[in-house]
Amino acid sequence: MSDSVILALGIAAFTVIVLVLVAIILFAKSKLVDSGDITIDINDDPEKAITLPAGGKLLGALASKGIFVSSACGGGGSCGQCIVKVKNGGGEILPTELSHINKREAKEGYRLACQVNVKGNMEVELPEEIFGVKKWECTVISNDNKATFIKELKLAIPEGEEVPFRAGGYIQIEAEPHVVNYKDFDIPEEYHEDWDKYDLWRYVSKVDEHIIRAYSMASYPEEKGIIMLNVRIATPPPRQPDAPPGQMSSYIWSLKAGDKVTISGPFGEFFAKETDAEMVFIGGGAGMAPMRSHIFDQLKRLHSKRKMSFWYGARSKREIFYQEDFDQLQAENPNFVWHVALSDALPEDNWTGYTGFIHNVLYENYLKNHEAPEDCEYYMCGPPVMNAAVIKMLKDLGVEDENILLDDFGG
């Protein structure tokens, strides 16, 4: 057999092998890779059904059709907010979901939308309020320091639009890939001490993907045309100086007047109960945001006559903000009082008010001698350590879970 014939046979055999492999790959792709259009039926309502190409996650599929399910972690599976009921399709529940969904809920079909693969037709059940959620491109009005590590971001809603939120609600804010240099932050001189002490100016936040985070609103519904947030910068802890800084908080701190920002909402469940019970608000740090929203709404919009008090914890005097606003509310409303406790007052503060941690101050100066602390409603938002301490104290006083309302975002 000549060399040319052998060569031709070799080429032919190789070609056949390649074609067979391509056929196998295409067959596997047809079975494993999502393709074609699928339909997601929603709430057994034909008008709400959506049709779209297969692929991706349920959270993104819904968002692509203007249905925005809350997800504070941006779809990472860590916040557990995007719980929906999948009645048909979606595959088996994943291990990543089981830390947020118990066995009973899993059996009933509850899933994290950010973890559900969209491979075929599905039937899902969504809360009706989700259909009122929208997106807006807002303009930054101002972004000013209110404390050493807290800025007040004030956004203008597009003209003619409104965000129909309730006090205690929150929005989600989005950011595209970006780089933020902390040395470029505009921070008043009075707050430089800690920034210099820990050399926080050296940090850089680099984000390579689109991110979404949730923030409670400090504004209340009567403040038309604006959204106001209190944002604490998430700097690396002193014991872990090489840890990356918070992505979204760094981005928000870099914003300047005139910048455009995309938000979606409104979302929320941290709403005031419609009762006559006494209201006790407890806050710390950026947990001020929903406290301000609730208290302003109760006193300025609803003109509530319910007995209420606000207990706020701060490190030192320069970390107190909105003081004039709350002083004025206290002067105008005999049913409202507010107190601040400093945990680390400075000598120059000349502080004569309460000192120590806010849960101890609240207990020693009010609840210890209260006739029926278990009958009050407690609204709180602050650092996790504060929240845990307050909840333990309330439990020891016999307060039931239904009267302890916690916003986890503000700390």
UniProtKB/Swiss-Prot annotation:
This is Na(+)-translocating NADH-quinone reductase subunit F. NCBIfam families: nqrF. It comes from Haemophilus influenzae (strain ATCC 51907 / DSM 11121 / KW20 / Rd). Binds 1 [2Fe-2S] cluster. NQR complex catalyzes the reduction of ubiquinone-1 to ubiquinol by two successive reactions, coupled with the transport of Na(+) ions from the cytoplasm to the periplasm. The first step is catalyzed by NqrF, which accepts electrons from NADH and reduces ubiquinone-1 to ubisemiquinone by a one-electron transfer pathway. The chain crosses the membrane at residues 5-25. [2Fe-2S] cluster binds at C73, C79, C82, C114. It is an enzyme of class 7 (translocase). Keywords: 2Fe-2S, Cell inner membrane, Cell membrane, FAD, Flavoprotein, Ion transport, Iron, Iron-sulfur, Membrane, Metal-binding, NAD, Sodium, Sodium transport, Translocase, Transmembrane, Transmembrane helix, Transport, Ubiquinone. PANTHER family: NA(+)-TRANSLOCATING NADH-QUINONE REDUCTASE SUBUNIT, NAD(P)H-FLAVIN REDUCTASE. It is found in: Cell inner membrane. Its cofactor is [2Fe-2S] cluster; FAD. InterPro entries: 2Fe-2S_ferredoxin-like_sf, 2Fe-2S_ferredoxin-type, Beta-grasp_dom_sf, Cbr1-like_FAD-bd_dom, FAD-bd_FR_type, Flavoprot_Pyr_Nucl_cyt_Rdtase, FNR_nucleotide-bd, NqrF.
